[in-house]
Structures are given as C-alpha cells and as structure tokens.
C-alpha cells in the first residue's frame, strides 16, 4: 500500500467517524461480539500461525495470546456501558447555578502499531480497547511475524468494514508512510528506538501517543527468599517465548549469601521445564529471525556461561542460558537482551542496589523475591519502574483489572480494561448553566 492509498484510507475512516456511527454503544458491542466469535472460530489457525512465526506450542499460544484477548473482550463487553456513561461531578459554590459533567468520547482515527513477539495479543488487545471507546482503527502488525499478520488481516476483513477497522501490512516503508499521516491517536508497542521516532513524527501534528516499550527489567532475589519458588517462577518468566517478552526478567540480582544455592535451583528448573535437550523440545520456541539470533548470540560470554549456551542456527534456537560473575560493564548489560540469556549479578546492600537500579534507564518491570515485607515495600516504593510482582514474574500484565504500561524510558501511558478504554477516550467537560428563576419586582 503506497502513501496515496494510505491517505485515502485514513480519509475514508475519518468520514465514517464523523458520520457518528461509532458513537452508538450497541454497535460497538455488536462489533466486539463479532470479533470474539471470529477469534473462537479461528483458534486452531491462530495457533498454527504463532507456531510458524515463533515456534509456540498450542498451550502457550492460548495461555499467552488467544485466551488473554478473549478475556479482554469479555471484560469490555461486561463494562462498556458503565465506562461510556456521562458522569456528574461536583460544581463549586461560585457556580451554584450550574451543573458539571464529564463524558468520554472517542478520539477519532487511531493508528495501532504492534510488534512481532506476541503478535496476536499485542495487536488485538489495544484494538479491542479502541473499538470499545468508539474509534476507527488502522492496525499495522509487524512484518517479522508474517503468518500471524496475514491471519489478522483476514479476520479483520471478515469482521469489519475498512471504514471502521483496516489492516495495513508491510515493512519499514509502510511504517514510514503511516507516520507521515495525521492520526488522532497513535498507540505503539515496540523498541525504544522506534518509539522515539514515533513520538518525533507524532509531534508534527501534536498527536497524543501511548508508547509501550521495554528495557532491562531487574529481578532481585534476597537472602530470605524461597529459592525453589524463585527459581521456578524466574525460569518460567525468563524463558517463556524464548525470552522474547517485554516484561521478562532481563537480569538477576541475587544476594551473595544465597547465590550458589539459587543457581543450583535454576539449573534444576530449566531441566524440569524444558527437558535435557531444550533445543528439540516442543515446549520451547525459537528466535524470530536470523538478525535477532545473531544479536542474542553475540551477547553470550562463553567464559561466564554456567548452563546452556548452545544453539542451532538452522532452527533459530538458543538454549536457555545462564551466565554467572556478570558485571554491569559486560556487553550483556548494555542493552535489553530480549532472548533466553540470564545474566546473574550479586549484591550485598539492598540500599546500594536500589540506587544502582534507579541510576539506569527506568525498566518496564521489576521483580523481587523475598519473605521480608518491609524490604518488599521499600523496593516497590523507592525503585522507579512500570509494574511488577513480588515473589512472581510477568503475570501482572495478564489481567484486565489493572493498567499495564511503562515509565520513563520504558514507555508512557497504559492500557487493559478500564485504563484501555480511558486511553482511547477524550473526556469532554460540560458545564450547564441553569437560568435563575424570575424575581418578583
């Protein structure tokens, strides 16, 4: 699709938006129900596409993508009428002849740019929120996950007219063309570098943006932690989707007094969860492409590897890898890993560690394994991060009841559930003056 085609599509959507069709709540509900039915009908095809793009098992595809999308639709269908209501708010005494109201309204034509690592979930979740809020949407999925992108395009055509929702496929040229256009809102999920470009381009039209980015998310294991529990949940969160998860624990900070015992548990858990030959395990996925395969492989210092480290270039698989005696100066600590490599650093002072974490770019997530409630409150209150867990990893994003989003370098804005509806809504304020009663002369 060239620049002219994209421009015409946007104008067609804008005309449809100003026809006021999307303001009808019942039509939004009908659209979401139609999408839900389509997803349920295509569950097998979704799993096949995700396996082709990322090597995901059927269980992982449903648990981490399809099931979460269906949950978000169900949540929105349950609450959309309440979210859409006009709300009366307090009016100050100085305006006692008036009444004040707020009411959410859609922005208009929205651009959603989604990534390749969870291509179905991260395309459909923001789409659901945008539709629920009454917007029209142009969805641009990643070219790196072509099978899933092609299926999404097919499903969207079945469910919606292009005036309401349309998919633009392609690569960098299409991304560039889209960002030259005037949208009413842009929602981007991806890397920090591209996020900066999205923000720069959006500023030309003063278009509001949500940026869901990433970063190096720390995971702290203190001396009081249940090490077996910590190892099991860290291994799950770190190596899920071959580490290609924006909120995966990027590196481990383990108290020096328990590090050896913790690493012993980590090795056991990798074998338990992925078998003795993870490169041939059906429960272990693959790296998205050769570019990222070589980038991740280049981060591994084989002199510091204590587990894993092998790979298969033909299948784009890298073993779950653990590196010990890592320092903050090592290559693996200079960028977000986004792969199955776990660097382990040690610490002795929690206060010093908090200072170190806060001196680095703000991460999307933070995890802390501890039995010390005082320490847990200290870390969550003093560290700057998007979201996280105490004694678990990654599951904080798998709910419609809490907003999910970054902070600082890891992004801005949030979504899921009510926060997703708010993200794609402009809240209009109205003050209605009530005429004074006629006074007797």
Predicted regions and their residues:
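N-terminal Rossmann-like NAD(P)+-binding subdomain of aldehyde/semialdehyde dehydrogenases
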Residues: 1-101
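Residues at or immediately preceding the N-termini of alpha-helices
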Residues: 6, 25, 43, 227, ...
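Short, well-ordered beta-strand elements within core beta-sheets of diverse protein domains
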Residues: 15-21, 112, 219-221, 251-256, ...
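Structural signal for hydrophobic packing residues in well-ordered secondary-structure cores
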Residues: 17, 21, 36-39, 43, ...
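Residue-level signal for inorganic ion chemistry
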Residues: 28, 73, 134, 165, ...
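Rossmann-like NAD(P) dinucleotide-binding subdomain of oxidoreductase/dehydrogenase enzymes
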Residues: 93-229, 267
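ALDH superfamily catalytic-core signature
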Residues: 160, 193-327, 390
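Conserved C-terminal structural/oligomerization subdomain of aldehyde/semialdehyde dehydrogenase
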Residues: 220, 271, 317-435, 439
